[in-house]
């Protein structure tokens, strides 16, 4: 049970046994070691982003099936997630974008959390335009200053939720590049994607905040625009953070999470599958298609 999240911050909390079906629960309670069955429920938090949802539900499914432990999932905004894991309300989060995107959040809690490992590397973020926008007209942030470009883009950058690190960096980018005629449309991942879908379908110009890994790069032909001042940052890695006593309280789950490594190509394929089916089905397919990878994560615990 979470102790400090308010109803305004807490978006969704579910127990994986209910989410992923009775069969997994029966398997967990009857076919696995007694030690695992007696362990406390693992509480994992994630932000409402496609990559965070996929990797968190994947970790939850593996912990449930292989360790026989119940998993509770909490979806909320970024700031409450960092606060939750630092206070011990959450056992772990699998979406700490570093060294730039979440630098402010991490800096406030780094002495109160443990880093279990890096789940994937080579993550990146920036602003994108559709491939049908000529590169001769828009190649970099500087090109957005052109009056004719600003007019075609309606002076708007399609953004994501207010608490995202990318939102903070994008607001700073508007200042760094003196893009005074632009506004950042703060919304959500879903809102940004809806705006992109509408514009792309009608071949209208747009510029949007974006990050990779993300399934949108498989659905749409998009192009990053150059950021010569590095206002948005460069390549990032995504870490797993846990509360301070998690490794001693639940060494099996902590060890499993510390071994989780996902190649970006595999992650993007899984996220794409989730768009065609559901995250639960895509997670089940990922586990079936990557037995050696899962075996490495589980080690001697499963």
What are these regions (language model features)?
Residues 12-16:
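N-terminal export leaders
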Residues 33-44, 146-154, 293-302:
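Immediate post-signal peptide segment of exported/extracytoplasmic ligand-binding proteins
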Residues 38-51, 69-74, 154-158, 257:
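Short, well-ordered beta-strand elements
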Residues 49-50, 72-84, 184-195:
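Short helix-initiation/N-cap motifs at beta->coil->alpha
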Residues 59-68, 143, 148-183, 288:
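Ligand-binding cleft/hinge of the Venus flytrap
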Residues 94-109, 198-223:
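A ligand-binding cleft/hinge motif common to bilobed small-molecule-binding domains
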Residues 111-160:
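A conserved helix-loop-strand patch within extracytoplasmic ligand-binding domains
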Residues 125-135, 236-249:
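A bilobed periplasmic-binding-protein/Venus flytrap-type ligand-binding module shared by bacterial periplasmic
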């Amino acid at each position: 049970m979470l102790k400090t999240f308010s109803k305004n911050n807490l978006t969704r909390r579910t127990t994986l046994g209910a989410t992923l079906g009775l069969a997994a629960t029966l398997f967990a309670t009857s076919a696995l070691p007694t030690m695992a069955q007696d362990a406390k429920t693992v509480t994992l938090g994630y932000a409402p982003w496609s990559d965070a949802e996929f990797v968190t539900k994947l970790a939850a499914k593996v912990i449930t099936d292989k360790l026989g432990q119940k998993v509770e999932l909490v979806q909320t905004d970024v700031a409450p997630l960092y606060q939750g894991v630092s206070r011990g309300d959450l056992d772990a989060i699998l979406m700490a974008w570093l060294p730039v995107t979440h630098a402010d959040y991490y800096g406030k809690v780094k002495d109160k959390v443990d880093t279990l490992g890096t789940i994937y590397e080579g993550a990146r973020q920036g602003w994108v335009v559709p491939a049908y926008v000529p590169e001769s007209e828009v190649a970099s942030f500087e090109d957005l200053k052109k009056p004719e470009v600003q007019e075609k883009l309606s002076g708007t950058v399609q953004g994501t939720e207010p608490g995202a690190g990318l939102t903070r960096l994008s607001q700073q980018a508007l200042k760094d590049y003196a893009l005074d005629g632009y506004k950042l449309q703060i919304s959500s991942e879903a809102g940004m994607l809806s705006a992109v879908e509408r514009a792309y379908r009608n071949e209208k110009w747009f510029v949007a905040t974006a990050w990779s890994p993300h399934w949108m790069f498989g659905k749409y032909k998009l192009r990053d625009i150059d950021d010569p001042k590095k206002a948005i940052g460069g390549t990032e890695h995504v870490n797993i953070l846990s509360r301070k006593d998690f490794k001693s309280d639940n060494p099996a789950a902590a060890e499993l999470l510390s071994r989780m490594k996902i190649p970006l190509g595999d992650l993007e394929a899984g996220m794409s599958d989730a768009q065609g089916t559901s995250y639960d089905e895509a997670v089940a397919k990922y586990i079936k298609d990557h037995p050696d990878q899962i075996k490495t994560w589980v080690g001697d615990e499963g």
